[in-house]
Amino acid sequence: MTNQTVRGTKDLLFDEWYKFKYIEQTANRISSLYGFLPAQTPIFECTEVFTKTLGDSSDIITKEMYSFNDKGGKSITLRPEFTAAIVRLLIEKKLQTPIKLFSTGPAFRYERPQKGRQRQFHQINFEVFGIEDPKADIELISLAQHLLTEFGINKNVKLEINSLGDGETITKYREALILYFTKYQNDLSEDSKNRLIKNPLRILDSKDEKDKSIISDAPKISNYYTKESSDFFEQILNGLTILDIPYTVNNKLVRGLDYYCHTVFEFVTEDLGAQGAVFAGGRYDNLVSSVGGKHTPAIGFAGGIERIMELINYSPKEERPIYLIPIGREAEKHALTLANELRRNGLYVIYEYSGTLRTRMKKANQANAKAALIFGDEELSSKTLKIKNMDTGEEKIIARDNTIENIY
């Protein structure tokens, strides 16, 4: 037996846990300002939920999924991302669109653990279904920018955006890339050789040094836009300008999944090393219909909570306790009732059961208590308590019935 976490997983304790919950709760609060409704899916799904949606050229499908056969022989996968499961939810529950859904929780990918990347990680996830207008893209990017500002990290995170265009654009661009990369086929990495057959756009996403110089001279997708694609992208860029959201058009940005069309974007930073994306997403108008639903335009993005934790400065507001110090058997019995009463009035209470008065007062100091309530037989008979202000050292006698009003 080993008493260590599995590689690529982390425990969360104390301040780190509070930081985690702060991010999750902030995202939930901001999402509601934009009309998002909460949605939660299981952490595992039938494997085909992901294989049918993510594309067989994606690294997630080829290398990273945690899949297993259950006792009934059915192939099950721990979710590697949220969109596929949310699409399954949309279809299964026959949700009416347009609709905006917010979700959060753990996801799992078999990757090399490093800063900002774990095998179990947590995401905040936003999906908009049923709106084809580019204003939905603008609003979603604005929401992401709002979150970054709320977290206090917007100055060090930059927006990169691209458009993959419509189906006609992607088809023409795919053909151009096949022609271009075929000339360098022998020089490409093994992954890119496989992608050349399955989805040449994914080569543009390669981080392999062997591919980078070849990619730098590859055709630009903007040369293949249809008028509709160009107009759609132009409206989004104009909207970002109106909202004063700075951006850089990155013609090589394609994202790591096969279902994207039109808008793709990432909010990136150099503060995370190689794992620079804080938020990432895009439009996927054909995904729902490709897995058995009706045609439903959609756009979404996700962010890694652990990555945000690496970037933000957050210290939880310290909650200072009230220390109960009963002296004697009868006082100890009454302390249970008093502790119960104080806690139900929203106060943080530590009931110190044993030790000398001096020892217990020392512990109250160590716990940074704001007040100590001290009582024995004398106080019980007079229905009073002695309260000590731990900051000033001031002591006074108060009526037992007025305890709440006299807490410092």
UniProtKB/Swiss-Prot annotation:
Its EC number is 6.1.1.21. GO terms for biological process: histidyl-tRNA aminoacylation. Keywords: Aminoacyl-tRNA synthetase, ATP-binding, Cytoplasm, Ligase, Nucleotide-binding, Protein biosynthesis. It is found in: Cytoplasm. GO terms for cellular component: cytoplasm. InterPro entries: aa-tRNA-synth_II (IPR006195), aa-tRNA-synth_II/BPL/LPL (IPR045864), Anticodon-bd (IPR004154), Anticodon-bd_dom_sf (IPR036621), His-tRNA-ligase (IPR015807), HisRS-like_core (IPR041715), HisRS/HisZ (IPR004516). It comes from the Bacteria. GO terms for molecular function: ATP binding; histidine-tRNA ligase activity. It catalyses: tRNA(His) + L-histidine + ATP = L-histidyl-tRNA(His) + AMP + diphosphate + H(+). Coiled coil: none annotated. Pfam families: HGTP_anticodon (PF03129), tRNA-synt_His (PF13393). Signal peptide: none annotated. NCBIfam families: hisS. Belongs to the class-II aminoacyl-tRNA synthetase family. HAMAP family: His_tRNA_synth (MF_00127). Homodimer. This is Histidine--tRNA ligase.
